[in-house]
């Protein structure tokens, strides 16, 4: 939407410079700046502090993974973290390991060594976006990236659990509600959702 429409096939603007400036003035300059500086990449141990801080801001203590748990997760499956940065600031991330087990269990949250790089299912343990950066589609962009990567890696699909109020949100990405999960993580009722390729 922010790219002027009146370009010829070679990408050369057909009108004068003033028209180009006018079109960009109509665009959301803040969105342009965020788009321009956003980076998505996997995690290394150097991201530990930032990841733990975002998690703590996004989830109640009973549900949030600890810094120590994230250290283990990054050690075993850093390539299955999708981190989004605004310049140097971590603003959103998605993570989860890969397994042949079809259902997400509470043990998986606590035992990163269960990761099996050749597994059939990409689990999603957390979808986190800092409150100040919500409602911009950043989490959705990371979910789509996780789906894209899982498909490229020839997984069977992805599995996550969510609260009742988010079923509709995840359904918009193709996840199907399978009902109440056996998970009691954080003493909360969770729905298991699955996207099968």
What feature does the model see in each segment?
Residues 61-87, 93-114:
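Active-site rim helix/loop that mediates acceptor-substrate recognition in acyltransferases
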């Amino acid at each position: 939407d922010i790219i002027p429409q009146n370009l010829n096939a070679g990408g050369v603007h057909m009108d004068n410079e003033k028209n180009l400036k006018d079109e960009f003035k109509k665009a959301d300059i803040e969105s342009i700046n965020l788009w321009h500086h956003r980076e998505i990449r996997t995690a290394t141990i150097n991201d530990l502090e930032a990841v733990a801080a975002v998690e703590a801001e996004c989830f109640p203590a009973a549900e949030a993974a600890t810094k120590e748990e994230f250290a283990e997760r990054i050690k075993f499956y850093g390539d299955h973290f999708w981190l989004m940065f605004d310049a140097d600031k971590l603003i959103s991330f998605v993570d989860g390991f890969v397994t042949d087990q079809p259902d997400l269990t509470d043990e998986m949250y606590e035992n990163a060594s269960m990761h099996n790089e050749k597994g059939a299912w990409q689990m999603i343990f957390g979808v986190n976006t800092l409150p100040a950066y919500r409602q911009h589609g950043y989490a959705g962009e990371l979910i789509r990236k996780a789906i894209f990567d899982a498909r490229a890696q020839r997984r069977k699909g992805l599995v996550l659990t969510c609260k009742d109020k988010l079923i509709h949100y995840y359904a918009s990405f193709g996840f199907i509600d399978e009902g109440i999960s056996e998970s009691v993580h954080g003493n909360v009722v969770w729905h298991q959702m699955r996207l099968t390729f």
